[in-house]
From Swiss-Prot:
Homodimer. It comes from Dictyoglomus thermophilum (strain ATCC 35947 / DSM 3960 / H-6-12). Its main location: cytoplasm. CDD domains: RlmH-like. GO terms for molecular function: rRNA (pseudouridine-N3-)-methyltransferase activity. This is Ribosomal RNA large subunit methyltransferase H. Specifically methylates the pseudouridine at position 1915 (m3Psi1915) in 23S rRNA. One of its GO terms (cellular component) is cytoplasm.
């Protein structure tokens, strides 16, 4: 399985970097996963920032990717449902799943419309840094569920 995670903005908090690195270390033996950090335009107005971020996100998408965008108004599913969805997607071995995590303003409507699925991690709002860490934890949990292995150690 190939997974790409597009994130608007960088990780500034060291404890989140440590968590991201830990989950990548756990996932890489089983899943080809990469994270692409794209620039944030948060210093601009919301409308302009969303347009600029939309442009760079679209440039980083390829044909055949199954796109899952994270958005607070997306579908809320359990970890078990996420695992089933993730591992039963109709993708070939050479294609990939791409997750998109927007910046402080979220993502544009065009990005949402380009998505195959819109996922909400919670009714609460998280920074892009926390969203990335939570997403990686949920991908790892989904892998453990799919492999019928215990998660807690």
């Amino acid at each position: 399985m190939n997974i790409k995670i597009i994130v608007i903005g960088k990780i500034r908090n060291e404890f989140i970097k440590a968590g991201v690195n830990e989950y990548l270390k756990r996932l890489l033996p089983f899943i080809n996963i990469k994270i692409e950090f794209l620039p944030s335009f948060s210093e601009l107005s919301e409308k302009i920032a969303l347009l600029k971020e939309e442009e760079i996100i679209l440039k980083n998408l390829r044909n055949g990717e199954f796109i899952i965008t994270l958005d607070k108004d997306g579908e809320k599913i359990s970890s078990e449902e996420f695992s089933k969805k993730l591992f039963k997607l109709p993708i070939s071995q050479n294609s990939q799943i791409t997750f998109i995590i927007g910046g402080i303003y979220g993502v544009s409507e065009k990005i949402k419309q380009s998505s195959n699925f819109i996922l909400s991690l919670s009714s609460m709002t998280f920074t892009h840094e926390f969203a990335l860490l939570i997403l990686l934890e949920q991908i790892y949990r989904a892998l453990k569920i799919q492999r019928n292995e215990p998660y807690h150690y």
